[in-house]
Amino acid sequence: MLKRFYTAIVHRRRAVLAAFVLAAVLSVFASRAVQVDYDINDYLPPDSPSTIALEQMNSAFTGGIPNMRVMVRDVTVPEALDYKEKLAAIDGVEAVTWLDDSLDVTVPLQMQDTATVETYYKDNCALFTVTVEDANRLEAVAAIQDLIGEDNALAGTAVSTAVATNSTVTEVAKIAAIAVVYVLFILILTTDSWVEPLLVLAGLGAAILINNGTNLMFGTISFVTNAAGSILQLAVSLDYSVFLIHRFAECRAARPDASAEDCMVEALCKSTGSILSSGLTTVIGFLALVLMQFQIGPDLGLALAKGVVLSLVTVFTFMPALTLVCYPWMDKTHHKPLLPGFDKFGRFVSRIMLPAALALAVIMVPSYLASNNNEYYYGAAHMFGTNTRLGADTAAIEETFGKSDTWVVLVPEGDTATQAELSDALHAIPEVTGILSYVDNAGASIPPELVPPDTLKLLVSGGYTRMVLTVNADTEGDAAFALVEKVRATVQQYYPDAYDLAGQGVSTYDLMDTITADMVKVNLLAIGAVFLILLLMKRQLLLPVILVLSIETAIWINLAIPYFRGRHVFYIAYLIISTIQLGATVDYAILFSDRYQEFRETLDKKQAIAATVSTVTTSVITTGSALAVVGFLMGAISTNQLLGQLGNFLGVGGLVSLAIVLLALPGYLYLADPLIIKPKKQPKEA
């Protein structure tokens, strides 16, 4: 059946090539229609309290939660009021709040509440709280930047989303371009034809283009998927095409009288099992992300799994067709291997493998403990460092006015007496520096008919009363999360299970709840699924344990490094890398164990280790270094610190996995040999 399918592919190779070229071209246009979402809060589960609160508020009120802070330096009160009018006139700006919304600015400020005044006006600097609608976010942020100039500052989620949108597109293109150059370089070193690297890149390019185009089925993808999807697909799928072409060359060398078509069919039949098992473990590892409640997980997991599947389809259909068309050029451009052999390295590893295995065993438990005791960032507040305009602006605003966030409490309309009691209770919380509400601005005893309609619709609408809280707190951290719990508990006393609370800090609190709950579930599923596949492949228990534990230890070491360096970790990067590193690098361990078992049929175990290292090093270094390079490129080029950290994790993880597979895993296989090997021959030990 398999042979018949492959025979049909090679005989209809020009039709196959035409179909893939057409699919790739169509995918280029389709990928342009895929929307990218840069707002991390959009990926909260639909049943999270803050998501429900936002939906309730958006259905009842026309204006959203303030999502930008704008600071203008060296202005008088009249000048600040003029800036407020200009800000409000910008297309996409829904609302602007300043001091005049809380106090009568015609009265000398020295005679008014200092805390309230300094929330909005301090050291001749005016701080405006702005609400920008999502649909016109990019244009509004650009217009505000033009209005205030380089000497003033703006920050907030609307700004970070706009900056991420503008920067990621160019950064991803730069990363991809350099990654392709590196992959071409490493392929030139590790292949024996000048044309072969171009064929491999053509196959990878077709698979990546089609994967990007078929993302249209999702409608919208996350910024993480947009930034990491293609380069991850490039790194993890690189060896499939190389393996097939090498099998084809081996078959032609072994059967010089056979036709190229027959050799290709033979190569496909011989390589299908190895390539499929390698791809399947990677796909399963990525699919574990689908179980995350935090929706970036399913978004990235499905896109990556789809990408690997498409890469496999490409290898078994497009690559045979392309290779058969181009193999005469491969023959003409054949050259001697540019890399030296790894025989000496194999003998070196056979000498140091036991100390390496012991060293890994010693650091295994400390690495596991350290990797689980990092300090985390959960939201978007720290995505841009002070080396960026946004990071510098955020620091400048916080230096003058302190950390601040805006939350919204929704309670049922009416019963202004209870609302007044709630307002008093909220004012009593030290971190609450101001409240805009019906009872605070109009007064509990004032009937709605006497309140100006424009003011009333901002505070009371759709059966709800809205209380806008300004809190002196960061958007995440222990203090911010404790404040969320305190405010929720306070409102619960007056409106038991009949209120909603929304805001950036509140959403980040729910993010923390969601993604920490995902951690154990996703990791256990990924490890369990990969282990089960290995169990079915190897039909024994010990070898899958050794292989999975080796890669898991590499993951623990990778994630322990920030702990020992005293660095915070983005929990999303932590969660994603745990699954991706397993899926992307367990192939190295599988390949090594497969070749070791083959060599043990004719060699003693020490010779088999040396031969295995010598044989697999080129293949493992090709894919491992590609993963590391694209990761480090992402870390170096991305101004988004979440993406940058994810990239650095990929880079370090690829190198650590590479080192463990080539240096320590041989020692474990050597020690476990009597339990995992049943050789056909039992040669004497050298």
Residue ranges and their predicted role:
Residues P46-M68, V72-A158, E375-Y376, H382-L543, ...:
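Structured non-transmembrane domains adjacent to transmembrane bundles in polytopic membrane proteins
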